[in-house]
Amino acid sequence: MTSAWSNEIQHEGLKQWIQEVAELVTPEDIRVCNGSDSEYAEVYSIMQKSGVAIPLNSDLHPNCFLVRSSPEDVARVEKFTFICTAKKEEAGPTNNWRDPQEMRQELQGLFRGCMRGRTLYVVPFCMGPLNSPFSLIGVELTDSPYVVCSMKIMTRMGAEVLKSLGTSGTFHKCLHSVGVPLSPGEKDVAWPCNPEHMRIVHFQDDSSVMSFGSGYGGNALLGKKCVALRLASYIARSKNWLAEHMLIIGVTNPEGQKKYFAASFPSACGKTNLAMLKPKIPGWKIECIGDDIAWIRPGSDGRLYAVNPEYGFFGVAPGTSEKTNPNALATCRSNSIFTNVALTPDGDVWWEGLTSQPPAGLIDWRGNPWQPGGTPAAHPNSRFTTPLQQCPVLDSQWNSSEGVPLEAIIFGGRRSDTIPLVYEALSWQHGVTIGASMSSATTAAIVGEQGKLRHDPFAMLPFCGYNMALYFDHWLSFASNASLKLPKIYGVNWFRKDKDGNFIWPGFSENLRVLEWIFRRTNGEESIAKRTPIGYLPEESSLNLEGLNLSSQALQDLLAVDVPGWLKEVADVREYCKIFGSDLPQIISDELFRIERELK
């Protein structure tokens, strides 16, 4: 192994770590990534030669390729995702905890020799704008070319980051391997992975990540969920900021007044659709800062400011269409990676929901000829990885080092009953209780059962890097700082169904009508809302429903306070919160009691 790579690195601590890792994992070669387009093309051609990357029709999707993963490696694996803290209580009841010393020993065993016959890529990345006080720098060491190409799209990656790191800057150590060493002369498989031994491990003592056995998205692109949420949420608590699973949008009304909102939904509940919403109501404009992660800090003026630490979108493909999200389709037209979607005979991509009828002659996500009526042609959690800057409705402040001031925070989930279309929290404490009470029908973004209701507080259940009860407490602490001008908090639910099981609300671009009401509320319009035990609900006449074919009964159903339903909801949340024991903040118990008392 030559040491030519070490000449490219001025940071002694980084050099030493790479050397230590190389001695453990014994790669054939080491390559420091510079993030250039030519490097991307070269690494992509390696993937093409190995058979994992299929170039798409360059007239339809220039500089795009399709990747098929192993059927055993298609989503985040929560049961193999661990948080290591000195004490189990620090990780809390919602995380898989392991003792850091024991886990390090176990991982040493797994990583020993795991990159034999492969290249170790050094991937320096920055979450957040370079040189922003918000940002965190990481270095991912990986043996996956797919990770290298994806990290170029999803993060600010390469030589600029190394330059910013200097000779002594702080960085997060992120070690990743697909976990499949190659013997001399052994032919590689298209998508190497090691499902028996998958581990995605977060060490909070030194803010590092080690991931083994999976090459898929959130398990392997360690800047995303691992650093930007699981590590960052832990860091944020001690430094008085928030790392959240939220989209960020700019909303401009016909008068030209602009406000920024953040919104939190569990995976596959429409974050990307809302982040890129195309308004049908004349004069309104929605612009996107991010669709998945928000880092939020108090600014010098007391308002909360948000940045998107990411540089790309990693969107769920199925259901994305010209009707549901034309801006997403425009974004991933070029320079994008498609994973586990179907392939058409003319070299284009397809997935369920893209068109009403599937084209003939599809090859499915497993690489087999596909016939309608059987299993889906595209995997339900198939993805597009695409640059942020290609979004046609990208907000001008997308790269602001200070972030944008939030005027509303929105919590939502996939609920067929009880939860109304929109309601406003009576206070910050009530708003935190709304976030803590979130539950949603599960989707394909996680391995396991789909369609059952699971509690997902703040949509952070899989991503909070410490005890969630202490996380609630951290949110509540913002109210005790009198100098802060906190945003209003809202609950929304696009997914209410009628007795025949049909969605009552049309959703998608029509969700702007709800954002319009929220916008007016943040302007202090009192007469458009009425106080109820569960929050301020819209007066029926205050929602702009012009051009919508919505019956008065449907509107009543969407805005009703279902007393028996809510009493059951409160009881259910209270039961769930028992897992936190005495760590649960008293304020949340008090809010639940208040809602119950007022309902009765």
Curated annotation (Swiss-Prot):
Function: Catalyzes the conversion of oxaloacetate (OAA) to phosphoenolpyruvate (PEP), the rate-limiting step in the metabolic pathway that produces glucose from lactate and other precursors derived from the citric acid cycle.
Protein name as catalogued: Phosphoenolpyruvate carboxykinase [GTP]
GO molecular function: GTP binding; manganese ion binding; phosphoenolpyruvate carboxykinase (GTP) activity
Quaternary structure, from the entry: Monomer.
Pathway assigned to this chain's UniProt record: Carbohydrate biosynthesis; gluconeogenesis
Entry's Gene Ontology BP terms: cellular response to glucose stimulus; gluconeogenesis; glycerol biosynthetic process from pyruvate; oxaloacetate metabolic process; propionate catabolic process; response to lipid; response to starvation
Cellular compartment(s): Cytoplasm
Cofactor annotation comment: Binds 1 Mn(2+) ion per subunit.
GO cellular component, one term: cytosol
Gene3D superfamilies: 3.90.228.20, Phosphoenolpyruvate Carboxykinase, domain 1, Phosphoenolpyruvate Carboxykinase, domain 2
Binding site for Mn(2+): K225, H245, D292
Main location: cytoplasm
Residues reported to bind substrate: R76, Y216, G217, G218, S267, N381, S382, R383
Family: Belongs to the phosphoenolpyruvate carboxykinase [GTP] family.
Alphabetized UniProt keyword annotations: Cytoplasm, Decarboxylase, Gluconeogenesis, GTP-binding, Lyase, Manganese, Metal-binding, Nucleotide-binding
Signal peptide: none
Protein EC: 4.1.1.32
NCBIfam families linked to this entry: PRK04210.1
Catalyzed reactions per annotation: oxaloacetate + GTP = phosphoenolpyruvate + GDP + CO2
UniProt-annotated catalytic positions: C269
Pfam families, alphabetized: PEPCK_GTP (PF00821), PEPCK_N (PF17297)
Required cofactor names: Mn(2+)
Binding site for GTP: A268, C269, G270, K271, T272, N273, R383, R414, F508, S509, E510, N511
Organism: Chlamydia felis (strain Fe/C-56) (Chlamydophila felis)
